[in-house]
Amino acid sequence: MPFNVAIEGSIASGKSSLIKELRSLAEDDNWKFFPEQVEQWKRLGPRRINLLKMFYQNPGKYALPLQTQVMISKVEQMQEAWNSYSTHIAIFERSFESSAEVFARANPLFSEVEKTIAQNLSDFLIENTEVDSDVIIYLDTDPEQCLKRISKRDRPEERKVDLNYLENLHDHYKSFIARSKIPVRIIKVDDPERSVKQIALEAYESIKSMLETSTDSSSEEVENGKFYPLCPPNCRDTDQVSLCTLNGSQTTSSEAVSETVKEVQNEILKVDIE
């Protein structure tokens, strides 16, 4: 059962750079990395739809399709991590939880109906799959600094991102962290004296420390019969099971959930791109 770590932060907060440095610090093959699937969102389906660009150009119209696709991508990644039982630490660029809790809420053009749909889908997937993060590393970055980085890297799909949106996103991240039941380690990354390598080392040591704490706690729970970390012998093939408990019950299988999210994805690809 992997230990899921989510690297969170605003747009251009340095998540990708941090993950790159963490790769170099990883001591062995037990660290597995899952970057955000941005390229997938820019080439969806046979028509190669750039859903990310469409969202930034018209966030009111395409926020729900994008956030739905983001959730689908994250479920697929976390299923892959779950099935890699030898992996002790899985590092994800952003958590599943932030899709509905941050980005859906941060869009001022999101209608109440769209927010409800995003939240309902999020709740369904949380209940029926293993998408929970064990720890969140949050890169706290000033919105103005993020805007400067966005301007510098000059990605076509980000050219309409403005300071107001980034400030709104920043505020929703703060609220998300305040509400979160998941342990959060906040790292300030605006200090020009600190290198990416120094920030990565801080994150690396935090992850190792929290993993040790989690492992000690989990061992006690196993001994007390509270949960079973992997699939018991009487269950079906482990690569089709999301979670098994000692009494033999199980959540919805990965196979069934995959079919559900594929149906949702097919609906996304029918989006009006005119």
Where would I find each of the regions flagged by the language model?
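Hydrophobic positions on the alpha1 helix immediately C-terminal to the Walker A/P-loop
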Residues: 18
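Hydrophobic anchor at the beta1->P-loop junction of P-loop NTPases
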Residues: 7
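A glycine- and Lys/Arg-enriched "phosphate-lid" helix/loop adjacent to the NTP-binding pocket
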Residues: 100-171
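P-loop (Walker A) phosphate-binding loop of NTP-binding proteins
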Residues: 10
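Conserved lysine of the Walker
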Residues: 15
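NTP-dependent small-molecule kinase module
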Residues: 147-274
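Glycine-rich phosphate-binding loop used to anchor ATP phosphates in small-molecule kinases
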Residues: 62-130
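Conserved substrate/cofactor phosphate-moiety recognition/catalytic segment
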Residues: 24-67, 72, 101
